[in-house]
Curated annotation (Swiss-Prot):
Transmembrane segments: none annotated. It is found in: Cytoplasm. Mg(2+) 2 binds at E67. This is Crossover junction endodeoxyribonuclease RuvC. PANTHER family: CROSSOVER JUNCTION ENDODEOXYRIBONUCLEASE RUVC. It catalyses: Endonucleolytic cleavage at a junction such as a reciprocal single-stranded crossover between two homologous DNA duplexes (Holliday junction). Its main location: cytoplasm. It comes from the Bacteria. Belongs to the RuvC family. The keyword ATP-binding does not apply. The active site is at D7, E67, D140. Homodimer which binds Holliday junction (HJ) DNA. The HJ becomes 2-fold symmetrical on binding to RuvC with unstacked arms; it has a different conformation from HJ DNA in complex with RuvA. In the full resolvosome a probable DNA-RuvA(4)-RuvB(12)-RuvC(2) complex forms which resolves the HJ. It comes from Pelodictyon phaeoclathratiforme (strain DSM 5477 / BU-1). The lineage of its organism: Bacteria, Pseudomonadati, Chlorobiota, Chlorobiia, Chlorobiales.
């Protein structure tokens, strides 16, 4: 099984491709997509899409593992991160790849055994589990490798991404959620 882990960001996007054969893990590629600070957000999203598409072409992963959005006090940052995630999701769907999403605490727990682990602890354990010396930098790279490892260690146990209108087993789609919980929806354009 080959998994592409992605740590999405609007300035740096980390990626890591890991192959699992039995109990052995091999890093096929890892790195960071550095986005030019003067580029527009749309140009950055395009760059992320193109560079990850090249990684997918070169290494043919069967699955993309992606970190979910954590809640942020900065709405602009959360929106930009959501748009980057959308580009990664669109790429995975366009290439007919499985897509699994993991919360940051779930990734940390899978890699270190502690959901509140620091980035340094995650980097140390990722490097140790994958026999990487030196530890890849920046943390975006080890985070992406950790996301891929989480998926492999969990056996791809996450339910594949569902499109709008479909629900996960026992869950609900976004439209169902909005209908059932209107008070939870942020109204951007109120009269």
């Amino acid at each position: 099984m080959v998994v592409l882990g992605v740590d999405p960001g609007s300035r740096l996007t980390g990626y890591g491709v890991i192959r699992q054969e039995g109990t052995f893990f091999t890093v096929l590629s890892c790195g960071v997509i550095r986005l030019h600070p003067r580029s527009s957000h749309a140009e950055r999203i395009g760059q992320i899409y193109r560079e990850l598409e090249a990684v997918i072409t070169d290494y043919a992963p069967e699955c993309v593992a992606l970190e979910t959005v954590f809640l942020s006090r900065n709405v602009q940052s959360a929106l930009k991160l959501g748009q980057v995630r959308g580009a990664v999701i669109a790429l995975a769907m366009n290439r007919n790849l499985l897509l699994h999403e993991y919360a940051p605490r779930e990734v940390k727990s899978a890699v270190t055994g502690k959901g509140a682990a620091s980035k340094e602890q995650v980097a140390f354990m990722v490097a140790r589990m994958l026999a990487l010396n030196p530890v890849p930098e920046p943390f975006d790279v080890t985070d992406a490798l950790g996301i891929a490892l989480c998926d492999l260690l969990r056996g791809g146990s996450r339910e594949p991404f569902k499109s709008a209108g479909q629900s996960r087993k026992g869950g609900m789609s976004w439209s169902q959620f909005v209908g059932a919980s209107p008070d939870m929806v942020i109204r951007l354009f109120q009269k």
